[in-house]
């Protein structure tokens, strides 16, 4: 996943931090953190002061993602690390990221602390399946949006709607349907789901999610 304010979610000397009695191994990198939660390895990395990339893979199953879309080399970015209760925080001069190492939830806010988007607690799912003899995963990620938040994007859809809230769309390029798993919010952020396989986008009062057939 890429967070653009910007954000990407790719579904795919260390400091050990113990927060509120919950021993969580959170390793600091130059511009982010890595940690394991809910049997998932997670990497949070600032690509610039306005771009955060989130990379998730099943625990101890590393996968080198050679994205056809995310070709940018991370810029040198000053990142401040801290703690907020049991959570770990990291921020640039534009974006604040708050990670719950226990639930896997991630909150993205602007520099004033206004919440932009939430990567939902326990919201990541990897489901194993056999892809023509090759072990693979279905992958699903859920987010929380504001009730009245308007989002645009998802490519060239033939629904006659501009606001993509409260819809279920099957994202696969065909005929006049050109699908791009990218949304832009009126709150001033954008989200790119870095996966090329057929994907179901769903938004309802409970959550917004991307559910991809293959963890590409």
Region spans (language model):
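Bacterial N-terminal signal peptides that target proteins for export
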Residues: 1-9
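N-terminal accessory segment at the very beginning of proteins
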Residues: 3, 21-216
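General helical structural elements
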Residues: 9-10, 57
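Bacterial N-terminal signal peptides
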Residues: 10-18
């Amino acid at each position: 996943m890429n967070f653009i304010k910007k954000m990407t979610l790719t579904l795919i000397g260390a400091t050990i931090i113990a927060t509120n009695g919950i021993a969580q191994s959170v390793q600091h990198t130059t511009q982010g953190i890595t940690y394991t939660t809910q049997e998932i390895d997670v990497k949070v990395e600032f690509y610039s002061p306005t771009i955060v990339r989130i990379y998730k893979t099943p625990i101890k199953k590393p996968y080198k993602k050679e994205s056809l879309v995310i070709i940018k080399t991370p810029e040198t970015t000053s990142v401040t690390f801290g703690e907020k209760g049991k959570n770990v925080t990291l921020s640039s001069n534009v974006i604040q990221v708050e990670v719950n190492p226990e639930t896997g939830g991630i909150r993205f806010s602007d520099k004033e602390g206004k919440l932009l988007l939430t990567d939902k607690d326990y919201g990541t799912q990897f489901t194993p399946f056999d892809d023509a003899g090759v072990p693979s995963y279905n992958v699903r990620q859920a987010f929380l949006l504001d009730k009245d938040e308007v989002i645009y994007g998802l490519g060239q859809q033939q629904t006659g709607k501009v606001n993509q809230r409260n819809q279920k769309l099957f994202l696969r390029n065909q005929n006049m349907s050109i699908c791009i798993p990218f949304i832009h919010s009126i709150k001033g952020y954008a989200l790119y789901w870095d996966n090329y396989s057929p994907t179901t986008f769903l938004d309802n009062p409970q959550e917004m999610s991307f559910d991809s057939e293959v963890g590409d």
